[in-house]
Amino acid sequence: MDMTLPIALLIDLMFGEPPAIIHPVVGFGKVIEFFDNKYRRRSPYLDFLVGAISSLVVIGLAFILSHLPNFLPNPFNLILSIYLLKSSFAIRSLHDHVKRTITPDLEEKRRAVSMIVSRDTKSLDEPHLNSAAIESLSENINDSVIAPLFYYLIFGLPGAVVYRAVNTLDAMIGYRNEKYEYFGKFAARLDDLLNFVPARITVLLFLSLGGRKVIRYYRMAKYKINSDKPIAAMSAVLGVWLEKPNYYKFPGRRPENEDIKRALKVYWIIVVEFLLIVAIILYGG
């Protein structure tokens, strides 16, 4: 029996993320940051071309890194495989980051939320801060748990590591603004492609908790290709509105501190559901 995934999961649940200085995802980020800082924007065509090449360099490095265990003897190949696989998902870290947003202190909440969302939190009131925390948790159920393990099931370690590299690229340069509109377009579209199936699997996992209401809210999620789908499902299950002002809003009552706690309970149910499915696929036969 291949113990790579069980040990990687155990390490994640016990210790969380490895130090930034040795974290592959941080390394991927530094490589794309280097290209981003060096390249001066010129034209839509050149910006797209340079952005695509820069992204492919990072993806190539991730692919090579994921194959390094094949060239190492036992037990070093297993150790590196476990380390790389664990680095591709973040179950405990996601929980811990969101848990820090559960506080009655508005400024402390604002600081905690600013660590997990890209939007400006300075002008957000408490309900919108609560919403932002729950939205981030919902979106990252897919990005940080379901999708990397989905690609591990299909393609093994390279699938998980390459997915994490693409997701990191999207998080850093996949924005619709003047600086990244074309430079980050390749990374953003590739991330959309890779997340299409996992995001919908994530929604299916919510059905055990919300049934038809999840389906109804899923049909409302027409704002983005993937990321709003798990957010809609979480809104349906919790019965609270989740809103990114000027982008989307799913109906419900006002989200409170207690709803972040409830969202974390939902998170663990979804994680356990998916891990059971993964275990059956990998070890059931």
UniProtKB/Swiss-Prot annotation:
A cellular-component GO term for this protein: plasma membrane
Annotated pathway: Cofactor biosynthesis; adenosylcobalamin biosynthesis
Swiss-Prot/TrEMBL GO biological process terms: cobalamin biosynthetic process
Main location: membrane
Database matches in Pfam families: CobD_Cbib
Subcellular location field: Cell membrane
UniProt GO molecular function: ABC-type vitamin B12 transporter activity; threonine-phosphate decarboxylase activity
UniProt entry keywords in alphabetical sequence: Cell membrane, Cobalamin biosynthesis, Membrane, Transmembrane, Transmembrane helix
Chain segments annotated as coiled-coil in the UniProt record: none
Topology relative to the membrane: Multi-pass membrane protein
Record-annotated membrane-spanning stretches: 10-32, 45-67, 145-167, 266-283
Protein family (similarity comment): Belongs to the CobD/CbiB family.
Matches recorded under NCBIfam families: cobal_cbiB
Function: Converts cobyric acid to cobinamide by the addition of aminopropanol on the F carboxylic group.
Protein name: Probable cobalamin biosynthesis protein CobD
Organism: Pyrococcus furiosus (strain ATCC 43587 / DSM 3638 / JCM 8422 / Vc1)
Lineage, opening ranks: Archaea, Methanobacteriati, Methanobacteriota, Thermococci, Thermococcales
